């Protein structure tokens, strides 16, 4: 691998290992100590300053793509020093779940997992040294994840026993921050603007983005109202939504229903040609224990791995949960929302996108994936299915898409408000309840996520930028426009920074 790209990957080990399939990093934990981060940034700066031509065969577009990711690393770890206030970086580095998927023989993965686990004590020492300014809301929101990191480890195993001791020290460190940390987790408008814009290679006007979020919320609410009026004329939307969420498969049938919707979504995507060259196998099944924190997720066969089935994981409720908790969990898999979730996770969403990434040209496109593009594409895919008449345009599906989208647009509004200082935490919870039909503990958890995931509005932002580019493509290409052409040219870029997508119109980067 070329030196600049290697220096960048060394600063994003867990991400490139799992999402790009760079398994030379197996068994290793990124050094997130203060000295380790400084050394990594120094290598990054040294490789970027070294004179020489672009990497072999690298286009100007890919050069800009690489430069945006380099700039983002400097902002996250240099300017904002996220390793000092966000335990999530350290949790991601220590996470063992990356070895569960069958990308290599079981013995090889077991050896890598054991080496990774043996490195936990050093990783915890680095985390405790770095995490010296964790805000109280960040620590409180992440404590369950910190405690759950060691789930399933066997204390009778000598390596695991040492790792568990280290894990206890990390839990104690974060517990103390949850009591004594700064009560204010806001980054400030300038920091949020840098965090959003630099990695996407585009200027960001937070005020304008907030206006766009409000307009999108209003559009989505109208979409939901229309769907509910078609389903139950004369009944209030909230009443219809409550009924839709109560209509779900039983816990033991959720995975099978997801399997059927997956086949339907793949067939529809292929029939309409919504994603070029859709191939590969998508296996649907219950999430392994290490992934049960997610209700539904895609784990794709990554670009640098041998081809293998991608995994669409579904997490039904635990059978020993109280009945009310099981019902709340199953509402996510209602017959309105499960199809929306599935087209997002599978096709034309993440699974289909992952297949395109395996065919992307060049190391930059195969390795560096803009999360705002990845999630924006999958969220956009939901609305494309509504436009294209998935399930013959049934209003139940449109209602499910609108409900999912209202949660995501509320995340964008809340992240802008909380980190910009204009929205108190109680107002953030109220927004989810009033505007997204998310209530009680679920609304509180959604609002709390903004503290440690300040860019979690990326789903809506990415979707809006793709839709805006689509309008421009229609105008620029005229009679040569088709949905198939737009998707093919866009996905050929891999998962680019949002600000570079416009290169498909002009043939040059940075015009988005």
Positions of predicted regions on the chain:
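N-terminal maturation segment of proteins
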Residues: 1-512
